[in-house]
């Protein structure tokens, strides 16, 4: 018969005047066995060969799991009114039940998380009972992260694109311009040209392999109706680490209403993006045309820019002062450097002389057309 060694002592490190159970040996919960923790757990020994239920229960105080070794539970129940705090990774291999209270991880240390292994699952998550901080998943099925912040459950949904790799996520109910634990702000005025607006109410941190896609969720407090006129205009956006700006990550599917719904991103590489949130694309009325450019190959202002035009199927024509077409293209992508490609010009396929030119821009979906002038200067 295996002997279990427990040391019971008073500890003020976690919660004043509460007792803590220190495991310095080897604890194992056998199949159909149950153990209830009404005090803090400090795991400095072996506690990873479990087949039964580990429950954490307290109707008055908070509880914590700490120690030098990671505990691994088969089934875990949390029924702690003032929350269960993790100071060490805690692993689940079958199921977790969020009966009462949050499981709180230190947001300033994303390496500590509640870890769902081997396609494990959870139940009973709510606005007031979820993982407040980081959760991870190791499996090959779709996973709906039970993450939240400030009494607000806001799942992120994804399928692991690389089986047996670890994906991790956390939700932040805060303005990305003023993040609480990140080193740098995420300026919502620093935008890719086709993006017009970014949510300042919330964001997610998501870590996963290349070729990932995510589904973000919202409710009425997300104020999606203040971002876009309709849900088809809504986008998933991400803060690009290298370019230091918000980029469009797409809208492959959207469901629900302004009050509650989901949006799917396109496939992207999470390693390139620090955080994710909701955004809106430039509308036709928000297209911004820069009339002056200097295509002298100095790396600054070398092309004719129509900010946001990449979002629209279009036709662009450029005319000289005699009304001759000197450049024409379908689906302009802000890459014209003043080189002629059409009409009767002296130096076809060469750059046009400095001077004033005129354009017509047609947006094909709406049929809207606009005209104006531009000036080339070398």
Outline where the language-model segments fall.
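Proteolytic cleavage junctions
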Residues: 18-19, 228-233, 240-299
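Exposed aromatic-hydrophobic patches
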Residues: 215-217, 258-269, 335-341
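Bacterial Sec-dependent N-terminal signal peptides
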Residues: 1-25, 276-278
């Amino acid at each position: 018969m295996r002997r279990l060694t427990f040391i019971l002592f008073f500890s003020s490190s976690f919660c004043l005047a509460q007792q803590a159970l220190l495991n310095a040996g080897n604890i194992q919960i056998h199949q159909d066995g149950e153990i209830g923790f009404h005090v803090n757990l400090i795991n400095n020994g072996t506690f990873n060969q479990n087949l039964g239920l580990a429950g954490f229960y307290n109707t008055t105080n908070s509880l914590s799991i700490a120690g030098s070794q990671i505990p691994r539970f088969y089934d875990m129940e949390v029924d702690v009114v003032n929350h269960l705090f993790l100071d060490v990774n805690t692993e689940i291999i079958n199921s977790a039940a969020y009966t009462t209270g949050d499981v709180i991880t230190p947001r300033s240390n994303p390496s500590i998380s509640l870890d769902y292994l081997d396609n494990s699952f959870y139940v009973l998550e709510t606005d007031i009972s979820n993982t407040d901080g980081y959760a991870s998943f190791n499996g090959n099925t779709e996973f709906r992260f039970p993450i939240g912040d400030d009494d607000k459950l806001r799942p992120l949904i994804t399928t692991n694109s690389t089986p047996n790799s670890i994906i991790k996520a956390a939700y932040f109910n805060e303005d990305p311009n003023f993040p609480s634990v990140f080193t740098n702000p995420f300026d919502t005025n620093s935008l890719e040209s086709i993006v017009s607006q970014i949510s300042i109410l919330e964001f997610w941190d998501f870590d996963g392999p290349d070729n990932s896609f995510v589904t973000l969720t919202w409710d009425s407090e997300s104020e999606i109706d203040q971002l876009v006129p309709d849900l088809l205009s809504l986008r998933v956006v991400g803060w690009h680490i290298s370019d230091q700006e918000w980029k469009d990550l797409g809208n492959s599917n959207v469901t629900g209403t302004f009050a509650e719904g989901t949006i799917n991103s396109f496939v992207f590489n999470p390693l390139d993006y620090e955080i994710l949130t909701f955004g809106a694309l430039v509308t036709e009325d928000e297209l911004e045309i820069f009339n002056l450019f200097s295509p002298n190959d100095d790396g600054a202002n070398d092309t004719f820019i129509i900010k946001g035009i990449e979002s629209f199927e279009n036709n662009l024509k450029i005319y000289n002062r005699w009304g001759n077409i000197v450049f024409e293209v379908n689906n302009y992508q802000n890459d014209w450097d003043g080189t002629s490609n059409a009409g009767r010009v002296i130096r076809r396929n060469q750059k046009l002389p400095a001077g004033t030119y005129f354009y017509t821009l047609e947006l094909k979906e709406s049929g809207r057309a606009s005209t104006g002038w531009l000036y080339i200067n070398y």
